[in-house]
Curated annotation (Swiss-Prot):
Disulfide bonds: none annotated. It holds the Pfam family IL6. GO terms for cellular component: extracellular space. The keyword Ligase does not apply. This is Viral interleukin-6 homolog. Initiates signal transduction through binding to interleukin-6 receptor subunit beta IL6ST, independently of the cognate IL6 receptor IL6R. In infected primary effusion lymphoma cells, promotes proliferation of cells, protects them from apoptosis, and promotes immune evasion of interferon activity. Also drives blood to lymphatic endothelial cell differentiation. Keywords: Evasion of host immunity by viral interleukin-like protein, Host-virus interaction, Signal, Viral immunoevasion.
Length: 204
């Protein structure tokens, strides 16, 4: 466990270096393999949160899934986002991914309060998801030759989540984890479908 924590600290250090950018530099290429690696790490942490929630509360996948009682508007990829195999549009889809990952920052603040003492690296995900958003933002800027700006999100969401009472708060944790797991899994599929090298036409 000690070596894994050390590896995590080193990785976080590299993310902090990239996260201190004021003006986003031009990336030489879209490092989708690195993004997929980070997403797989995120999915692992989400799975560990599910396990911890199941152990502590009995709210488990396939046994008790309370998501239906919540109506929070969380990041989701829909048919209109052009991320499917049919009608795929790289620019539209990447914008959706960037929007979602920037919104994940608030959700991981909530998850850190719920799992920060029992799940390793959940506190790191807040920075990781912001880094994912930055990386996709750079690619969007190259594709569109404009500056992508994240949309304004519901600033009261974190307060509402943290203000929930005991069991309802656990149910909310399950719902948030489910939405994030689905979004991150779809993002991996989307990134795998994008060519490894951005066409030279973007640089002309």
């Amino acid at each position: 466990m000690r070596w894994f924590k050390l590896w995590s600290i080193l990785l976080v250090g590299s993310l902090l270096v990239s996260g201190t950018r004021g003006k986003l530099p031009d990336a030489p290429e879209f490092e989708k393999d690195l993004l997929i690696q980070r997403l797989n790490w995120m999915l692992w942490v989400i799975d560990e949160c599910f396990r911890d929630l199941c152990y502590r509360t009995g709210i488990c996948k396939g046994i008790l899934e309370p998501a239906a009682i919540f109506h929070l508007k969380l990041p989701a990829i829909n048919d209109t986002d052009h991320c499917g195999l049919i009608g795929f549009n790289e620019t539209s889809c990447l914008k959706k991914l960037a929007d979602g990952f920037f919104e994940f920052e608030v959700l991981f603040k909530f998850l850190t309060t719920e799992f920060g003492k029992s799940v390793i690296n959940v506190d790191v995900m807040e920075l990781l998801t912001k880094t994912l958003g930055w990386d996709i933002q750079e690619e969007l800027n190259k594709l569109t030759k404009t500056h992508y700006s994240p949309p304004k999100f519901d600033r009261g969401l974190l307060g509402r989540l943290q203000g929930l009472k005991y069991w309802v708060r656990h149910f909310a944790s399950f719902y948030v984890l489910s939405a994030m797991e689905k979004f991150a899994g779809q993002a991996v599929r989307v990134l795998n479908s994008i060519p490894d090298v951005t066409p030279d036409v973007h640089d002309k």
